Amino acid sequence: MKVTFEQLKAAFNRVLISRGVDSETADACAEMFARTTESGVYSHGVNRFPRFIQQLENGDIIPDAQPKRITSLGAIEQWDAQRSIGNLTAKKMMDRAIELAADHGIGLVALRNANHWMRGGSYGWQAAEKGYIGICWTNSIAVMPPWGAKECRIGTNPLIVAIPSTPITMVDMSMSMFSYGMLEVNRLAGRQLPVDGGFDDEGNLTKEPGVIEKNRRILPMGYWKGSGMSIVLDMIATLLSDGASVAEVTQDNSDEYGISQIFIAIEVDKLIDGPTRDAKLQRIMDYVTTAERADENQAIRLPGHEFTTLLAENRRNGITVDDSVWAKIQAL
């Protein structure tokens, strides 16, 4: 089915208000969920909203909590999210990293005791729109087996890198071949994954999203490489924030909350003049996209460039929402 941005935001806002979230916070949170969905990231927008409400009702998310600065070391700051709303706090933390970068050339905010930030790409994009390189990542509850294991002991720990090119170039990727949100999107659409995304119960690689969702044997991105990246990202976020690791979140908490996150902004214009920056970025993009195609019908894409097109299409034609997901939201 198709809905407008306004309908989507109003539905989110209604549910948040009914759960006792104050009107200003509810409006800002509903706006972020709707913007994420409008950008085409359904897995961490509309599809994720019922799960967000469940955690709100369980007390994992404290809607009136505000992040608190713990330590300041010039370009580096350490904050405690105090289990506040994840996407609103993440936006504030990237804003703070940008402020630090304006003063120091680079800004790093390490956040502990946080909640799921929903679409991580929002915060990298936020920095790139202002002319900064944006880098951020988060740890999570253990939802992926380390390479060679059958049991989940590491997080998908998504990493975002956004570059202020025209259009913005951005990688937003979990350390698994697919996020669990994208497994859900493909399952709801009745599609197999385009490439192997995990193992079945017999230990064979599979493209069946429902099987992987059930047995949790999701495949690390690049096999052992994604497994290794997940581990070191967790270590850095844990140390810099003095927060909880994947092991602590998984073993000590009843659900995924109290996680650790990193937000970095770099002011490019302190290092290179604008015309030179733009020319260098354009040359990189042209060099990549003019490579001989393996399939003449398949364009060579640059990461993140599709979001401008998706956003325009959704604004023009309406936002596609799975019927079953919309029914869940209406029933909340």
Swiss-Prot record:
Binding site for NAD(+): I168, T169, M170, V171, D172, M173, S174, W224, K225, G304, H305, E306
UniProt subcellular location: Cytoplasm
The protein, known as: 2,3-diketo-L-gulonate reductase
Catalytic reaction list: 3-dehydro-L-gulonate + NAD(+) = 2,3-dioxo-L-gulonate + NADH + H(+); 3-dehydro-L-gulonate + NADP(+) = 2,3-dioxo-L-gulonate + NADPH + H(+)
Name of the coding gene: dlgD
Keyword annotations: Cytoplasm, NAD, Oxidoreductase
Highest taxon above the source species: Bacteria
Family: Belongs to the LDH2/MDH2 oxidoreductase family. DlgD subfamily.
Major localisation: cytoplasm
